[in-house]
């Protein structure tokens, strides 16, 4: 029998010190990594529940184990909420990650050697959309599309490439593209060449759920996503699709790619989908857009170049070359002041992916804390102060003090 009095701090103090240190870091630092966010206490409560004890291979009503009547209810609730949230015909909430959700789609409609079009990783795409370092780039013939001289997607060029290479699958979505995608145009291109159309909306899912960014579900054959990032749920993945793909996708997830689903994580996904359907979530996402736009414009006013000229989403890239800095260096200097960003390649970057010429900045986490335009502008000015004086210890110390003043005013988790 387990004693509930024996909590983690008692059972494993060595681990607990790291958990507490990370909690303090999240409390005190300004988080600007676009793929990170804070989950609600309800999401964490679901993920830390006794549902973690239950094995449930299969799907609701079709399990390989007994005792699944209650976890069936959990998973069906998550499926129903997800379908309603995005207007989908079919949904699968079992993928453990966005990468596995993408793999499930690939393996349901592609064969090794098939041609796939996805956004160039160096122009803002994602590893799983055909990078040579990823399984997708090793199994399939990848033909990338990218940005034009204005650092916008060139749909005419995309169509020209598609007509030439005749892909089996066209992929939309990105990890570092600030502007809006034209899903309808991409669907039309896919239709012209007889390709399936898949959208990986991982970065934009929360914005889409709130109706402040275009919804790909009516246009795409398949839509995948993570459940964290802007959606503010637990770490995990999901798939939505036309109803005709239900059987092939279900079998592609289980038993082809995964075994038992993580029922405690699926429960947390269900909570996140419920939260995303509330009016306050729409207000949150509207503020995410305002904060990102404010930061981009403020940094531009301080002499920094914003890739694509600005942002229409939660994220944007900053070209550091005018400052004579690399992304790796800027990441480190800002980190000393307790501002967390990530180095990121910019289009046609002369530096390696481990160094880069840019940084990626996102507004989801600071908006969850309650930051509005005034605070977003202050954060951007703090970033610019560091980038203007990266080796000045007095500037770093003064900036860190201002960061702590901000974060103390806006705690992540209140009473």
From Swiss-Prot:
What does this protein's UniProt record list under function?
Catalyzes the reversible interconversion of serine and glycine with tetrahydrofolate (THF) serving as the one-carbon carrier. This reaction serves as the major source of one-carbon groups required for the biosynthesis of purines, thymidylate, methionine, and other important biomolecules. Also exhibits THF-independent aldolase activity toward beta-hydroxyamino acids, producing glycine and aldehydes, via a retro-aldol mechanism.
Q: Does the keyword Lipid metabolism apply?
A: no
Coiled-coil region list: none
What's in the GO CC field? cytosol
Q: Can you say what this protein is called?
A: Serine hydroxymethyltransferase
Tell me where in or outside the cell this protein is found: Cytoplasm
For the biological process aspect of GO, one term held by this record is: tetrahydrofolate interconversion
Under Enzyme Commission nomenclature, its number is: 2.1.2.1
Provenance organism:
Methylobacillus flagellatus (strain ATCC 51484 / DSM 6875 / VKM B-1610 / KT)
């Amino acid at each position: 029998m387990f004693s509930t009095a024996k909590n983690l701090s008692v059972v494993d103090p060595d681990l607990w010190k790291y958990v507490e240190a990370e909690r303090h870091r999240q409390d005190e630092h300004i988080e600007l990594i676009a793929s990170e966010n804070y989950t609600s206490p309800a999401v964490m409560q679901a993920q830390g529940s006794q549902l973690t004890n239950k094995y449930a291979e299969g799907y609701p009503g079709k399990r390989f184990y007994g005792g699944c009547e209650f976890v069936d209810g959990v998973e069906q609730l998550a499926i129903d909420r997800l379908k309603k949230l995005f207007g989908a015909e079919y949904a699968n909430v079992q993928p453990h990650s966005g990468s596995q959700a993408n793999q499930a789609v690939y393996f349901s409609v592609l064969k090794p050697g098939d041609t796939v079009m996805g956004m160039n990783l160096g122009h803002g795409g994602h590893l799983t959309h055909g990078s040579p370092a990823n399984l997708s780039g090793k199994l399939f013939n990848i033909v990338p599309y990218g940005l034009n001289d204005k650092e916008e997607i060139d749909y005419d060029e995309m169509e020209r490439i598609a007509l030439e290479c005749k892909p089996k699958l066209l992929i939309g979505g990105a990890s570092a593209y600030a502007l809006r995608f034209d899903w309808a145009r991409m669907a039309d291109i896919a239709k012209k060449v007889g390709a399936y159309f898949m959208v990986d909306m991982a970065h934009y899912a929360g914005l889409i759920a709130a109706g402040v960014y275009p919804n790909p579900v009516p246009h795409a054959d398949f839509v995948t996503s993570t459940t964290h990032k802007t959606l503010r749920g637990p770490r995990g993945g999901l798939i939505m699709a036309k109803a005709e793909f239900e059987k092939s996708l279900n079998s592609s997830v289980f038993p082809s790619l995964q075994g038992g689903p993580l029922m405690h994580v699926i429960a947390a996904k269900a909570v996140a989908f419920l939260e995303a359907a509330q009016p306050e979530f729409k207000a949150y996402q509207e503020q995410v857009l305002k904060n990102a736009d404010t930061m981009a414009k403020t940094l531009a006013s301080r002499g920094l170049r914003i890739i694509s000229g600005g942002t229409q989403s939660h994220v944007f890239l900053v070209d550091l070359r005018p400052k004579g800095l690399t992304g790796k260096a800027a990441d480190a200097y800002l980190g000393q002041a307790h501002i967390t960003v990530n180095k990121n390649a910019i289009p046609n970057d002369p530096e390696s992916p481990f160094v880069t010429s840019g940084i990626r900045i996102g507004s989801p986490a600071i908006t969850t804390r309650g930051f509005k335009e005034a605070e977003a502008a202050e954060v951007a000015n703090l970033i610019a102060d560091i980038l203007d004086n990266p080796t000045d210890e007095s500037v770093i110390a003064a900036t860190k003090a201002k960061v702590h003043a901000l974060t103390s005013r806006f705690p992540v988790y209140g009473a």
